[in-house]
């Protein structure tokens, strides 16, 4: 395949992954900051141990901070223009690795409350993130001159 086409595909794949995770964590984290703890949160998690430790408010804000950190990492990757040939995708890979832990947090809450459909969805997000991380690590290295 033509090396210019390969570089375009690499850049497009990394940019799309970067923008997707920037969007996912940006909307999730910023909406939590803007709206605060939702009214349903106590009803869903109030009967779990999370109500005692670390507490529902702390649980909500720890999740929010986790999402905002993923958003910030994705933002740094985009600002560094890691999707271009000259840059290794260090912050993009960090975004994806951290996202695995955020999806783990989200999935834990779903499984804890016996929301098995939600838990399965988080499992699929986790799996998709693993695929994205593999792609970013595989194509995320700068192209070598021949």
Q: What is each PLM-predicted segment?
A:
Residues 1-31, 60-65, 69-146:
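Extended, low-polarity transmembrane helix blocks
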Residues 33-55:
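Membrane-interface interhelical connector segments
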């Amino acid at each position: 395949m033509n090396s210019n086409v390969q570089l375009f595909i690499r850049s497009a794949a990394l940019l799309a992954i970067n923008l997707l995770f920037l969007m996912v964590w940006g909307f999730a984290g910023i909406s939590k900051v803007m709206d605060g703890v939702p009214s349903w949160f106590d009803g869903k998690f109030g009967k779990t141990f999370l109500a005692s430790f670390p507490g529902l408010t702390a649980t909500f804000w720890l999740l929010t901070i986790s999402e905002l950190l993923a958003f910030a990492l994705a933002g740094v990757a985009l600002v560094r223009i890691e999707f271009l040939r000259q840059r290794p995708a260090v912050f993009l890979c960090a975004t994806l690795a951290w996202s695995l832990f955020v999806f783990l947090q989200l999935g834990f809450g779903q499984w804890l409350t016996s929301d098995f459909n939600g838990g399965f969805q988080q499992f699929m997000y986790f799996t998709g993130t693993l695929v994205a991380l593999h792609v970013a690590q595989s194509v995320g290295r700068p192209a070598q001159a021949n």
